[in-house]
């Protein structure tokens, strides 16, 4: 029997489908998702939870005309499948393939690019106001998860939307609650009343008639208001949105397609902003994902029958795990150490810390700005707060780093995970800007370890410095080196010469140091013995060592996994320029001034001629060119 999904190429193909067809299609979409993501990896559980919701949205609205903004965006896979990208789905998050997030450059159905949390309502409000100014009539929707709704930006946008009374719909996809039968039935009934225009006309007529009754009409009206208020406050969550100027509808069963369509159709007819509160089950339809939704939030390839990842040979621990284990070990000896994360406990490696030191662990939710200033307050009172955060999300709190931490010299430690190329998440999550935006801040010390053992030592060093410190380290497995037992601090503001050579010097930081060593090994086969220097500190830079290297070598190359503008190579160039040695710096090996796409690190490096063999070719071509000119 031919599957319905084989006939669905755009959302227009849904328009003629019956409810029975849509429910069957929902099953097929889940099968397709599970099969595909078991091979490519991706955000499985969130997308299994929004199958019916996405079908209802595409049935009621016209994604080509209407504007749908997905927040955070990782739950947009069904949207992609329904908008002509089904055949490309095997390339999801692969180099040169489909993005895991909405991307306007990828499809005209993607109204707005997302990837960072809590931005959808702001973007949707901007589009709604633009529509009004232009005199057009498209619908505007923001689909936001309950996690993203915890971000302050979402409430800033709702406050503004309520003030503007713009016609727009916010769909709150809440997968943290479950609706019992009685509550669900009552909710459905109340939702139908509140979304049916006839209800509002009757309510207004009753209020008008009551007010006209002599003597007792006013009292009766007050009684009605008290009853109404009592009922409203039974639905406290809705009240928050109502007070912000939204019409609140819900909770709605997010897996009931007819009910979703009815509510969305009624929401379209309302004036002003509407919030539709939808309850969904994360991982729905796949037992392992329902049982362990966090595990399948973002997953690698897995076996469909069991949900287990393919067994791999034992490898080095991840940088995140080494960080988590190390900071826990330090905390056992130092009671002033506390850990803070912004809704990324597992991702940053703090799960065990939270279990062992619950009173010293703080998950502030998706609130990076608050996390940083909260840490500054703790530091002000004598604690050693360690903020574990991804590089891409630290950007969101730049003002707080400057104003609340560094300007006051508060000793906050920033443990910056996912620095550099991050893989499948792509442009929105690349950690390629932190060296540039951090090194310009006074009072801040910036370090980058060459391997997981050096990360241990840097953490121990940071805890013993009464200054703000940032340590950036990459995603994924470490280098497999032996970890330290005593974790002796590293010498302050000093790099290390790993190999002593002549003529050519390679100076780098972080993840690129092992790459430098690989290049050095290959150059040695060509008869060239380069010096390899691990700078360790981006700020303050070990200028004395770098100047000494510059005076002894003819060709200097810098290596970093950061954008070229304002990064480590720029720092070295500035140092050399001050002393008339800028001509010695031949090339800065780094990422260009553009947004770097998703894909495996090795493929991304090759795309930008930063793979080991390509770097060697650049160095050899320069040296051979010089020899030819001299000859």
UniProtKB/Swiss-Prot annotation:
Annotated Gene3D superfamilies: 3.40.50.920, 3.40.50.970
Cofactor requirement: Mg(2+); thiamine diphosphate
Catalysed reaction, written as an equation: D-glyceraldehyde 3-phosphate + pyruvate + H(+) = 1-deoxy-D-xylulose 5-phosphate + CO2
Matches recorded under InterPro entries: Dxylulose-5-P_synthase, THDP-binding, Transketo_C/PFOR_II, Transketolase-like_Pyr-bd, Transketolase_BS, Transketolase_C, Transketolase_CS
Binding site for Mg(2+): 146, 175
The keyword Transferase is annotated on this UniProt entry: yes
Disulfide bonds: none
The UniProt record lists the keyword Transferase: yes
Keywords for the protein's UniProt record, in alphabetical order: Isoprene biosynthesis, Magnesium, Metal-binding, Thiamine biosynthesis, Thiamine pyrophosphate, Transferase
CDD domains: TPP_DXS, TPP_PYR_DXS_TK_like
GO cellular component, as recorded: cytosol
Principal EC category: transferase
Pathway: Metabolic intermediate biosynthesis; 1-deoxy-D-xylulose 5-phosphate biosynthesis; 1-deoxy-D-xylulose 5-phosphate from D-glyceraldehyde 3-phosphate and pyruvate: step 1/1
Family: Belongs to the transketolase family. DXPS subfamily.
NCBIfam families (UniProt xref): dxs (TIGR00204), PRK05444.2-2 (NF003933)
Quaternary structure (record): Homodimer.
Function, as annotated: Catalyzes the acyloin condensation reaction between C atoms 2 and 3 of pyruvate and glyceraldehyde 3-phosphate to yield 1-deoxy-D-xylulose-5-phosphate (DXP).
Name of the protein in question: 1-deoxy-D-xylulose-5-phosphate synthase
């Amino acid at each position: 029997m031919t599957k319905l999904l084989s006939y669905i190429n755009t959302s227009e193909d849904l328009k003629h489908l019956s409810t029975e067809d849509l429910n069957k299609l929902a099953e097929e979409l889940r099968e397709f998702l599970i099969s595909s993501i078991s091979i490519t990896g991706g955000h499985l559980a969130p997308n299994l939870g929004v199958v019916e919701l996405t079908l209802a949205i595409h049935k009621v609205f016209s994604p080509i005309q209407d504007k749908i903004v997905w927040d955070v965006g990782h739950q947009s896979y069904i949207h992609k499948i329904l908008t002509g990208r089904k055949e490309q789905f095997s390339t999801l998050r692969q180099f040169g393939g489909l993005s895991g997030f909405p991307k306007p450059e990828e499809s005209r159905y993607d109204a707005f690019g997302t990837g960072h949390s809590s931005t959808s309502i702001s973007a949707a409000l901007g589009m709604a106001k633009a529509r009004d100014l232009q005199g057009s009539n498209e619908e505007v929707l923001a689909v936001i998860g309950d996690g993203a709704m915890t971000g302050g930006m979402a409430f800033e946008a709702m406050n503004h939307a309520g003030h503007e009374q713009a016609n727009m719909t916010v769909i709150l996809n809440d997968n943290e609650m479950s609706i019992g039968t009685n509550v669900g039935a009552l909710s459905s009934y109340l939702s139908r009343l509140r979304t049916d225009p006839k209800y509002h006309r009757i309510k207004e007529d009753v209020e008008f008639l009551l007010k006209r009754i002599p003597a007792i009409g006013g009292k009766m009206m007050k009684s009605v208001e008290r009853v109404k208020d009592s009922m409203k406050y039974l639905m406290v969550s809705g009240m928050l949105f109502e007070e912000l100027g939204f019409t609140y509808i819900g909770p709605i069963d997010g897996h009931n397609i007819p009910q979703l369509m009815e509510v969305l159709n009624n929401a379209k007819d309302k004036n002003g902003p509407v919030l539709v509160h939808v309850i969904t089950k994360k991982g729905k339809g796949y037992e392992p994902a329902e049982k362990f939704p966090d595990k399948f939030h973002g997953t690698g390839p897995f076996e469909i029958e069991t949900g287990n990842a393919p067994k791999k040979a034992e490898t080095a621990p991840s940088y995140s795990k080494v960080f988590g284990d190390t900071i826990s070990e330090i905390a056992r000896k130092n009671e002033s150490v506390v850990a803070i994360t912004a809704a990324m406990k597992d991702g940053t490696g703090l799960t065990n810390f939270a279990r062992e030191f619950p009173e010293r662990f703080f998950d502030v939710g998706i609130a990076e700005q608050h996390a940083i200033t909260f840490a500054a307050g703790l530091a002000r009172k004598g604690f050693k707060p360690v903020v574990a955060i991804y590089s891409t999300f630290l950007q969101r709190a730049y003002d707080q780093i400057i104003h609340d931490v560094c300007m006051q010299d508060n000793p906050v430690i920033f443990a910056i995970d996912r620095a550099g190329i991050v893989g499948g998440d792509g442009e929105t999550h690349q950690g390629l800007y932190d060296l540039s935006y951090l090194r310009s801040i006074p009072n801040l010390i910036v370090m980058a370890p060459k391997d997981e053992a050096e990360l241990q030592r840097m953490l121990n060093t940071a805890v013993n410095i009464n200054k703000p410190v940032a340590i950036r380290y990459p995603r994924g497995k470490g280098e497999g080196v032996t970890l330290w037992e005593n974790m002796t601090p590293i010498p302050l503001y000093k790099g290390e010469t790993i190999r002593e050579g002549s003529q050519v010097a390679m100076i780098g930081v972080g993840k690129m140091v092992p790459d430098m060593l690989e290049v050095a090994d290959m150059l040695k086969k060509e008869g060239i013995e380069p010096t390899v220097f691990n700078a360790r500190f981006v700020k303050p830079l070990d200028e004395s060592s770098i100047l000494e290297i510059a005076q002894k070598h003819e060709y200097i190359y810098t290596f970093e996994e950061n954008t070229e503008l304002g990064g480590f190579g720029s720092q070295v160039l500035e140092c050399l320029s001050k002393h008339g040695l800028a001509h010695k710096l031949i090339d800065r090996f780094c990422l260009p001034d553009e947004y770097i796409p998703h894909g495996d690190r090795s493929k991304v490096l090759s795309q930008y001629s930063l793979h080991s063999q390509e770097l060697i070719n650049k160095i050899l071509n320069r040296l051979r060119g010089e020899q030819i000119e001299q000859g």
